């Protein structure tokens, strides 16, 4: 009798413990975005992501050099029991969670840092001179690993396969294009990308249907004349004067040739020529970037930039050679959000952070190589995750040596990415047929 009573007490204790575990965030249902956010905000979970972010931040790596970052990602995936393939595009990693069959939806994080010196003095400052995570990619990797952990905890509930894409070389290297070329995203139906935003409040997400970021390209031109003594300009052919006229003329491409309602940018950010006060150099090198949302406008800008540089140099008796640098820096197409995915995003995000915290985002003239995925995947969606908190004081902008991450944003990114992927699979089940379909695996 006593033994039976003890057994009942033990069973009751186990039941209480199980109920307690079910009540915590880890027991949140996969189709409950708010519950997944609570899970990601738990002290141990959030602290784990913060630790990952700081380790990556201390050891920044430039595009196609993310070997240590890639190793960290693979080590964490191993610890979570998540299978992956490696390498893609030198350092890229592609992991999968779920059934291994369709539908397939992807989540992407970029891994590379910037060639700049960090000026923020804190415990986890960059240990690599001249390199810094100044755009938040360290946070992106930590959040995607957080999403991986959430999804792995619910792997038996997934109605398909989530593909986790850890991509190198977003900052000008076109890593997304090389991931595609290496077969990293075959058979995927939709992909979501996120970027931390310094001007969007914490707990708020923002995006829009259609164009969200511009297409971009770079150009460089060498303008050659005839050098000589500055006191005898009539014996020279001055490339500095020619380059100055070129730069002024380039500004007219937007102000006088572009439709004011069709946003375009041409900026010259590089001017190198001469090294002495009293010497006219033989040549000058200028360089810059051009941006547009429409493919036709982008191509028109490219054509006119070359025409203006060559023609204006000729007027000044100089020669010019223009290089668009697209072999090493491929042109980025505009980032276009699929209209159907926007409605889906608003619905899922509203369930997590509330409708008032899902906001429209004006298009940006910045560029994102996430745009390349639209060439290989039917539906793509890119959004911004808020991290601004006025109590922290002024937030330095992206690509500033004083840029910092509000680590309170990490749980929001991890939970929302996981929720978007899981809900997408649930709502895009393939039709049931008696025959196996083609392309039913990655």
UniProtKB/Swiss-Prot annotation:
Pfam family, one: Peptidase_M20
GO cellular component term, pick one: endoplasmic reticulum lumen
One Gene Ontology term from the biological process aspect of the record: auxin metabolic process
Residue numbers covered by motif Prevents secretion from ER: 439-442
Lineage per the UniProt record: Eukaryota, Viridiplantae, Streptophyta, Embryophyta, Tracheophyta
Keyword annotations from UniProtKB, A to Z: Endoplasmic reticulum, Hydrolase, Signal
Protein name per its UniProtKB record: IAA-amino acid hydrolase ILR1-like 1
CDD domains according to UniProt: M20_IAA_Hyd
Family: Belongs to the peptidase M20 family.
Superkingdom in the source lineage: Eukaryota
Family matches, as NCBIfam families: amidohydrolases
GO MF terms, alphabetically ordered: IAA-Ala conjugate hydrolase activity
E.C. number(s) listed in UniProt: 3.5.1.-
EC class of the enzyme, as a word: hydrolase
Keyword Signal: yes
Known function: Hydrolyzes certain amino acid conjugates of the plant growth regulator indole-3-acetic acid (IAA).
Keyword Endoplasmic reticulum attached: yes
Organism this protein belongs to: Oryza sativa subsp. japonica
Signal peptide start-end: 1-27
Gene: ILL1
Main subcellular localisation: endoplasmic reticulum
């Amino acid at each position: 009798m006593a033994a039976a009573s003890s057994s009942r007490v033990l069973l009751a204790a186990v039941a209480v413990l199980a109920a307690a575990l079910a009540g915590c965030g880890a027991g949140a249902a996969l189709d409950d975005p708010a519950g997944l956010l609570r899970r990601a905000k738990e002290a141990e979970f959030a602290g784990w992501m913060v630790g990952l972010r700081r380790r990556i931040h201390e050891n920044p790596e430039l595009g196609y050099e993310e070997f240590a970052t890639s190793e960290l990602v693979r080590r964490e995936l191993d610890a979570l029991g998540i299978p992956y393939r490696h390498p893609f595009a030198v350092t890229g990693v592609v992991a999968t969670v779920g059934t291994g069959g369709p539908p397939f939806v992807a989540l992407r994080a970029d891994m590379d840092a910037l060639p700049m010196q960090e000026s923020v003095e804190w415990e986890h400052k960059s240990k690599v001179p001249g390199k810094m995570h100044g755009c938040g990619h360290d946070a992106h990797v930590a959040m995607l690993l957080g999403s991986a952990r959430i999804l792995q905890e619910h792997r038996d509930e997934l109605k398909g396969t989530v593909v986790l894409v850890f991509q190198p070389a977003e900052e000008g290297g076109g890593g997304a294009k090389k991931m595609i070329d290496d077969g990293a995203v075959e058979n995927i139906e939709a992909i979501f990308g996120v970027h931390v935003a310094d001007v969007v409040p914490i707990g708020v997400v923002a995006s829009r249907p259609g164009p969200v970021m511009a297409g971009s390209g770079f150009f460089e031109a060498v303008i050659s004349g005839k050098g000589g003594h500055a006191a005898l300009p009539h014996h020279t052919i001055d490339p500095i004067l020619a380059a100055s006229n070129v730069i002024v003329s380039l500004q007219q491409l937007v102000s006088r040739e572009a439709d004011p309602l069709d946003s375009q940018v041409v900026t010259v950010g590089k001017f190198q020529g001469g090294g002495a006060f009293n010497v006219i150099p033989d040549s000058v090198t200028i360089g810059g970037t051009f941006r547009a949302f429409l493919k036709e406008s982008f191509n028109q800008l490219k054509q006119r930039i070359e025409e203006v540089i060559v023609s204006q140099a000729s007027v000044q008796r100089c020669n010019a050679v223009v290089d668009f640098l697209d072999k090493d820096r491929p042109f980025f197409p505009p980032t276009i959000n699929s209209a159907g995915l926007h409605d889906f995003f608003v619905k899922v995000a509203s369930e997590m952070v509330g409708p008032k915290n899902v906001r429209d985002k004006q298009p940006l003239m910045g560029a994102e190589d996430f745009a390349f995925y639209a060439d290989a995947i039917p539906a793509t969606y890119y959004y911004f995750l808020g991290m601004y908190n006025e109590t922290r004081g002024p937030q330095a902008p992206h690509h500033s040596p004083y840029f910092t991450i509000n680590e309170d944003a990490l749980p929001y990114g991890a939970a929302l990415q996981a929720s978007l992927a899981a809900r997408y699979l649930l709502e895009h089940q393939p039709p049931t047929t008696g025959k196996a379909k083609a392309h039913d695996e990655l």
